[in-house]
């Protein structure tokens, strides 16, 4: 299988966009894959993806899979099942869990990779807040795929790291964070209330602060 080729699960959010730039900086040939699994943010995500890829003039076209019926077997705020009486970002964050989402997405990406003879899959997971964003899960998924179809390397450089790591990479790679889209309540604009909007705004502020701090250091 192609050694320097990778299937990227791309959502147009900060994490997968920074991962896109990270992969490009390492000279990977990227095959972007976007999956519509019935998420409320589908339109905004796809619009952001198309803009980012157009600006980068990437070699390979985006493959978009429309599978909105997956929302019928899933649950949570991501597919419009909003919780009642939410009083904190932590409660909203917990409600956004779509059970088994990353296993589903990685399985589809692996199938696509098999067709293209690509043995690497990249996914922009950060930290370990959910079970399917941990290193343990990713390693188990590699083993499962090896038993199922072929050996794959799951590239997830930010797994297990705090978001600050992503922001530092975004600054280093000059990622246009404001071109990204992350909202779990609205279809094509940011609600500025959900956890994803909150995290995105916080990330942009940290990114700008990082730039100011480095500029101040360079003055000495």
UniProtKB/Swiss-Prot annotation:
GO terms of biological process kind: queuosine biosynthetic process
Cofactor: binding details: Binds 1 zinc ion per subunit.
Enzyme Commission number(s) of this protein: 6.3.4.20
Reactions it catalyzes: 7-carboxy-7-deazaguanine + NH4(+) + ATP = 7-cyano-7-deazaguanine + ADP + phosphate + H2O + H(+)
Superkingdom assignment: Bacteria
Enzyme class: ligase
UniProt keyword annotation of tRNA-binding present: no
Cofactor(s) of this protein: Zn(2+)
Residues reported in the UniProt entry to bind Zn(2+): 183, 191, 194, 197
GO MF entry, a single one: ligase activity, forming carbon-nitrogen bonds
Pathway terms, separated by semicolons: Purine metabolism; 7-cyano-7-deazaguanine biosynthesis
Keyword line: ATP-binding, Ligase, Metal-binding, Nucleotide-binding, Queuosine biosynthesis, Zinc
InterPro entries: QueC, Rossmann-like_a/b/a_fold
Binding residues for ATP: 10-20
Annotated transmembrane regions: none
Described purpose of this protein according to its UniProt entry: Catalyzes the ATP-dependent conversion of 7-carboxy-7-deazaguanine (CDG) to 7-cyano-7-deazaguanine (preQ(0)).
Subunit structure: Homodimer.
Recorded family membership: Belongs to the QueC family.
Name used for this protein in its record: 7-cyano-7-deazaguanine synthase 1
């Amino acid at each position: 299988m192609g050694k320097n080729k990778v299937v990227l699960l791309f959502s147009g959010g900060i994490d997968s966009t920074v991962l896109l730039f990270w992969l490009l900086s390492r000279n990977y040939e990227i095959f972007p894959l976007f999956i519509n699994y019935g998420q409320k943010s589908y339109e905004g995500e796809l619009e952001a993806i198309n803009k980012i890829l157009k600006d980068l003039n990437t070699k390979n076209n985006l493959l978009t899979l429309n599978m909105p019926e997956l929302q019928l077997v899933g649950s949570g705020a991501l597919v419009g099942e909003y919780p009642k009486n939410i009083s904190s970002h932590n409660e909203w964050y917990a409600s956004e869990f779509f059970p088994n989402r990353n296993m589903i997405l990685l399985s589809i990406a692996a199938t696509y990779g098999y067709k293209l003879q690509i043995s690497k899959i990249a996914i922009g997971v950060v930290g370990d807040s959910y079970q399917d964003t941990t290193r343990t899960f990713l390693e188990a998924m590699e083993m499962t795929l090896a038993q199922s179809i072929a050996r794959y390397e799951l590239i997830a450089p930010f797994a297990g790291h705090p978001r600050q790591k992503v922001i530092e990479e975004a600054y280093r790679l000059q990622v246009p964070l404001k071109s990204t889209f992350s909202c779990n309540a609205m279809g094509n604009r940011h609600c500025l209330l959900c956890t994803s909007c909150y995290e995105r705004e916080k990330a942009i502020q940290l990114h700008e602060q990082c730039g100011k701090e480095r500029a101040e250091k360079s003055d000495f």
